[in-house]
């Protein structure tokens, strides 16, 4: 299973790394895709890199730079802990444990990747997504779920965190 969350690029206007990010809006996108050939659920999360950096700094009482190679191993530790505490999935009534694959930064966006093994079919998926709700009450989380080529999507405005999809 791979989880994807993203923040829209090109919408960042910060004056310092310690100042809260200022965007016209705050958005993250999580994409969940059933890969039937590998029997995995792939999850990717895309978000603004500076928002992710700042919430990880706040939660872990440390100063980091998401672009710095020296901090990559720390982010590889903090990102899965953060995402797993804010993104919960249930497939056909069973809670899903997903493994962290890694992250990459591209311009203003951070992409975080996860995967759950041994999932060959999905009839129903229940999602609780509060990613970056602890960063701003302006947060919007968009979720895309793709099963057998059929895509369903929803938008969760703060404080709403739950979405249910049936296939």
Model-derived features with residue positions:
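N-terminal soluble domains immediately following signal/targeting peptides that reside
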Residues: 20-167
């Amino acid at each position: 299973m791979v989880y994807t969350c993203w923040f829209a690029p090109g919408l960042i206007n910060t004056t310092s790394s310690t100042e809260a990010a200022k965007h016209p809006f705050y958005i993250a996108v999580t994409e969940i895709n059933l890969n039937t050939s590998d029997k995995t659920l792939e999850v990717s999360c895309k978000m603004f890199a500076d928002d992710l950096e700042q919430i990880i700094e706040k939660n872990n009482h440390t100063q980091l730079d998401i672009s710095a190679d020296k901090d990559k191993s720390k982010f590889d530790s903090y990102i899965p802990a953060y995402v797993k505490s804010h993104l919960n999935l249930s497939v056909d009534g069973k809670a899903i444990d997903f493994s962290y694959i890694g992250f990459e930064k591209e311009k203003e966006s951070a992409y975080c990747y996860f995967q759950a093994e041994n999932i060959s079919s999905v009839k129903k998926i229940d999602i609780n997504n509060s990613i970056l709700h602890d960063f701003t009450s302006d947060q919007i989380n968009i979720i895309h779920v793709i099963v057998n080529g059929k895509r369903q999507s929803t938008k969760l405005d703060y404080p709403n965190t739950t979405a249910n999809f049936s296939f």
